[in-house]
Structures are given as C-alpha cells and as structure tokens.
Amino acid sequence: MDEHVPLDAETKAAEKPEDHRDELRLWLRLLTCTTLIEGEVRKRLRARFGVTLPRFDLMAELDKAPEGLTLSDLSKRMMVSNGNLTALVERLVATGHLARRTSDTDRRAQVVSLTGLGRAEFRAMAKEHERWIGEMFGELSRREVEELLRLLARAEASAGGAVNGARS
C-alpha cells in the first residue's frame, strides 16, 4: 500500500531544486529548524512548568531589565502588539509574578518588572530551557556551533539590509 507522507516545505523544495533558488531552500531550512525547536520548547515548558512560550519570553525580557520595561518597550522587544501583551501582563500581575508601576518619566506609561517570585520561577525555567537547547544542538561540535553563529550573523545582517532598504 502506497502511503502518502506529508513533506515539509524544505523537502519539497529539494525534490525540484531547479524550481527554487538556494536562498529559498536556506530560508526553508531555517524555518524548519525554528519550527521544530520552538514546538518542542513549547511542549516542554507546558509539561514541566505549566507555562506558555509567550509567558517565558516575557519573563526573559524582564529578567534582562531589572528596573522594568514599559509595555511599549516590551512589545517592541517581543515583536508583538501591546494588545497581545496586556492580557498576559495582567495575568502575571494577578499571580504575583510581575509588579506594575507608573513610569517616573511619563505618567501615561506603565512599567512592569519581575517580582522576587517571578524572577525565581523564571530562573528555574531558564536553567531547564538552556539544558533543552543544549540537548537539541548536542550533535553539533563546538566548532560547528561557532561557524553557524558566524554564518547566521551574516545572514541576519544581509536580511536586515534588505528589509531596511539598503538593497533592492
């Protein structure tokens, strides 16, 4: 019996390489890796800590800014709308993980920061997260990781140049 196995976009592109530029195949490979890793991280965060990836990401941003961040700054850093962020912040304030105060420089803006409870819980999650990521890239040598970091920095600069209009 011939079973149809669904393919990811990268595999489809490889089947007819004449139909795709190498840059497209590269983008699809990056997307496949990101989707695979992000899905596993989401699953593990939910199973181990009962939290979502957006909650983890928000707490990570605030852990890097002990003085706190405005909702506007948080939404820029996380690349989400203020509306998406507001409900999550409200839930974390209600559970005691975040504190909210009025900005000293702009009375219209609210600044949120991790509480002691929030910071302790985030750091426990971050430790596990780091271990998981290490496990997922565990078959790469130190040299391969360094080379990928170098190449991805160049890819980011190239994409940034194109996005920001430096090239057409």
Which residues fall in each region the model found?
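N-terminal leader segment of winged-helix/HTH proteins
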Residues: 1-49, 168
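Charged, amphipathic alpha-helical coiled-coil/dimerization segments
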Residues: 2-6, 12-14, 90-150
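Short, solvent-exposed coil/turn segments
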Residues: 23, 73, 105-107
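Hydrophobic alpha-helical core bundles mediating ligand binding, dimerization, or RNAP-core interactions
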Residues: 23, 27-45, 122-141, 145-159
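N-terminal helix-turn-helix DNA-binding core of bacterial DNA-binding proteins
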Residues: 35, 39-81, 95, 164-168
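Conserved amphipathic alpha-helical interaction elements at protein-protein interfaces in regulatory
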Residues: 47, 64, 80, 99, ...
